[in-house]
A protein has these predicted regions:
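C-terminal domain-closing interface element
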Residues: 355-374
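Active-site substrate-recognition segment that forms the wall
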Residues: 201-236, 245, 249-253, 274
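Conserved mid-domain beta->alpha element of the FAD-binding
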Residues: 6-36, 158-159, 185, 215, ...
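Short, flexible helix/strand-to-coil boundary loops that buttress conserved ligand/catalytic motifs
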Residues: 42, 58-59, 68, 88-89, ...
């Protein structure tokens, strides 16, 4: 199909996964990363069975399984009482139901597995300090504009350039991302600093009124990932700002001492203000397509942002490899992904409101509802999500 390389704007998880997927079906690509180095900002990431399906398709399943920490359960705790509300076991029955485990991994380790696979491919070229600013289409070619660099011609352009995508800005021309009013503070601490009574082999969520705390082990139990979020109605987006423990503490003075001690032990806290966008029905423009956060940014509450980007990469590369022309491939890709990702975007917001942050009677309703669900029922409720990540054959 292609006589020129695909150009991929963005060298994050979605961009590298797309390059690997395209190489799997015999297509070359050039990955353009705006930063001076390829890497990931952040710490832990949860990888559900659908993510492992993506890893297997991309040819990095074995490597990712070596990096992952396999937790025993997803645990929901009451941040006001200190008691467990419910948990979802991630045991043999879970793995038999979905064909893959649920695990956690350091984001940098996931990115590095993809990066090393890209470097080992003869079909992928990686370029740093290449910020894409726009594109122009003519005939069977797309010309990509790069800040302070010569234009680059390719067969197609994939905008995997994140929440503030320049490719999306030209294609969609919509408003800036929507500021959620939720502020997240992140820290990674050595395991010996984690309170002994909270060193659980679980992804643990302490849910409280307008706030929550998440923690789980990483890097072979050498460290714990701490993520605490406060719905403080902040209006301005912010990314990775260093913050004091005292400022983090302000949003959690009302919760039980047991989860609050997580904040006491956190170090080097950094602040993010969560943003998303309203879902859209189209992210294809001729020979240009969006992917991941550039197409469908979502809040963190379903722990599916990176998973959805990798599913996008699987779908796009599969359709490019099986369709007769690019128009058909991109149309099928959009059909594969639009409704599914819209559901995840909307559900992520709803989960934040009704599972993570309710208070009073709404919290009591949440507890009663979730305690009544059996593990088998949980598996069925999650099947639509965790069964993804494989190429659709229609």
């Amino acid at each position: 199909m292609a006589d020129k390389p695909f150009i991929i704007s963005g060298g994050g998880i979605g961009g590298l996964a797309t390059a690997l997927g395209l190489s799997r079906v015999g297509h070359s690509s050039i990955v353009l990363e705006q930063s001076s180095r390829l890497g990931e900002i952040g710490a832990g990431i949860q990888i559900a069975p659908n993510a492992f399906n993506c890893f297997d398709y991309l040819g990095v399943g074995n490597e990712m399984r070596k990096e992952a920490v396999y937790i025993d359960r997803l645990r929901l705790m009451d941040a006001l009482t200190g008691d467990e509300i419910c948990h979802i076991p991630l045991d043999t029955a879970f793995q038999e139901r979905f064909g893959n485990p649920y695990a956690v991994v350091h984001r940098a380790d996931l990115h590095n597995v993809l990066l090393e696979a890209c470097k080992a491919s003869g079909l992928i070229e990686l370029r740093t300090s290449h910020p894409v600013t726009g594109y122009h289409q003519e005939g069977g070619t797309v010309t990509v504009r790069i800040l302070d660099k010569q234009d680059l011609k390719g067969y197609a352009l994939i905008g995997a350039d994140g929440l503030h995508s320049a490719v999306r800005m030209q294609m969609i021309g919509d408003d800036p991302p929507r500021v959620s009013g939720h502020t997240t503070y992140r820290s990674v601490i050595p395991t010996e600093m984690m309170p002994k009574d909270l060193r659980w082999n679980a992804a643990t969520l302490w849910a409280g009124p307008k706030c929550h705390i998440v923690h789980y082990p990483l890097k072979g139990w050498k460290v714990f990932n701490l993520v605490v979020t406060f719905h403080n109605d902040v209006k301005e987006a912010m990314t990775g700002k260093p913050i004091s423990r005292e400022e983090v503490y302000r949003g959690f003075e009302h919760i039980h001492p047991r989860p609050r001690q997580v904040i006491d032990h956190g170090i080097d806290w950094k602040l993010w203000v969560l943003c998303d966008r309203e879902p859209i029905t189209n992210w294809v423009d001729g020979r240009v397509a969006l992917l991941g956060d550039a197409a469908h940014p979502m809040l963190q509450y379903f722990a599916q942002g990176a998973c959805m980007a990798m599913e996008d990469a699987v779908s796009l590369s599969h359709r490019v490899g099986t369709c007769n022309n690019l128009d058909s491939a991109f149309a099928q890709y959009l059909e594969d992904r639009m409704v599914r990702t819209t559901r995840v975007v909307i559900d992520s917001s709803l989960i934040g409101d009704h599972i993570y942050h309710p208070s009073g009677a709404q919290a009591a309703l949440r507890n009663s509802f979730m305690q009544a669900i059996t593990p088998a029922e949980w598996f069925e409720r999650l099947a639509w999500l965790y069964g993804g990540g494989k190429p659709l054959e229609n």
